[in-house]
Amino acid sequence: MGNKSTDKTEKTEKTEAFTVKKLAEWISIKKIAVAVGFAFFASMVPNWLLAFIARPSGDDYGYSAASHQTWLHTHSVIEVLRTGLETTKQMCQVWNGDWFSVFIFTLMPEAFVYRSFWIVPVFWTLAMIAATYYMVHEVFTNYFGLKWYEGGVVTLLILLMFYQWIPSSGIGMYWYVGVIHYMMPHVLAMLLIGFLLKYLRTDKFRYIIFSVLGMIAIGGSSYYSAFLVLFSYVLMFVIVKNKKRAGVFAFPTFAGMIALYFQVTAPGNAARVGGEQMGFSVGKAAFTIVEALWQGAVNVVNYWRETPLLFVLLFFVAVVAWECLSEAKLKFEFKYPVLWVGYMFGVYAAMYAPELYAATEVSGGPGTMEYLTFILTTVSSVIYVEGWILRKLELRHTLKRREIYHKCITVPAVFVCLVLCLVFRGNLKDSLFYSSCSYIASGQAADFKEQMESQERILRDDSIKEAYLCPTNPEQGPLMHMPVIKNPEAFTNRVVGNFYGKDMVTTTE
């Protein structure tokens, strides 16, 4: 009896061990990458569907009104570009200094082709995906020698965190001016960091030329992305041992600083925030630095309190990255983890500086860029610290086999994260996916589409010079729309009228 019982126990243990081993083998990093990819792209589907409902709004019409009228009367791209330059010059004198962004503002797709606004959210989300992957791929595949899908899973997790809890979906996708002012420079920044790494690896000067062009565009667009790239250049200059080789970074750095100088000193900036407030002072700069560091720390706590699921995904990034890095060719030394983490926090905190220094009310753009930079710098810090630990373990010959780690850590972490998703399911309701699905399912998206079509039938009728529009309901879901109101002198009313060539635009109520 005793032997039979022992045999049965051993058989059960072997079966359980076999099952766990098979499960661990089945849940590979590649399958995790596929699952995360499916989750990310599935979460973006309702947002891309709403792209075909989204319409231009407010400033979208204002900046491109003259370009649209020029196109209608001439159908000449050259004339439209000339008009765009005139609008840019005017706006830099009276309102804002981001000259490159303003020029792109004037070229809104809708200025050329009716119902082409869907291009904005679809193209720029795809551009964000491609640029983020390009940068991560350069590090994970070309520097660490990992497989493409190992960098892919990190990329997808970064994008999933960003888009699902984005502070402003309008800035991220549905407001043309917001997308061009914030997302376009960030896409360029990701590419430029990739170009920088590419140059260091290949010594091909064309990547410096690309970087010069990119920095000119960023310097004329966004302080946030300019800071991000400039901080990256400084970091790489310090890290690279061959200073003569690293000195080539001076070309894109100076190009960006010159472009940024023209943006900062444009008269429109002073007009926008009250003249003397744009003046430089050492005291104000010191206050801005201290306050930016404080605000950065406070908002990290706020992210933790308001979106704990974000930190669950960051934990999963750490788990997956460790397994991938355990087989990486870690030629980089990872000597100073504390300094790296501190520097990354400084880069993140720097995103608060422009709004603090200007001391003026801002749109949802700064909060969106601060959040995105927090994700990027946190992931960077996690990977650096893990690289440092792995280098230490390698030197001491105590590094565990990847198979053991995968079975004992990665696979359980998958299930732990799934359980935590249930625990923090309230955050799922805060996600952009849930918001978009609710907006579509409730019928509000269809109502918005019908209301926009009703207004546009009147606005596109050239025989009508005084347009009386039915008012829209305030339910916009994740979309971004500044409605026409009763007052014909209101900003939105005037710019819509200018875009469509109307003498007056108002509502029937």
Residue positions per predicted region:
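Transmembrane helical hairpin unit
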Residues: A321-S431
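Transmembrane helices and adjacent periplasmic/lumenal helix-loop junctions
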Residues: I209-M236, L422
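Membrane-interface micro-motifs in multi-pass membrane enzymes
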Residues: K147-L197, A350-I383
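Transmembrane alpha-helical segments
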Residues: M128-F140, L188-L200, L230-V238, F316-A321, ...
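Short hydrophobic alpha-helices at membrane interfaces in multi-pass membrane enzymes
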Residues: K198-A217, G247-A250
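Hydrophobic alpha-helical transmembrane segments of multi-pass membrane proteins
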Residues: I119, F123-A127, L160-M161, I180, ...
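Transmembrane catalytic cores of multi-pass membrane glycosyltransferases
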Residues: P46-A111, S116-W118, Y176, Y223-P366
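Intrinsically disordered, polar/acidic, low-complexity terminal segments
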Residues: N3-T6, E16-N96, P109-G152, K243-R245, ...
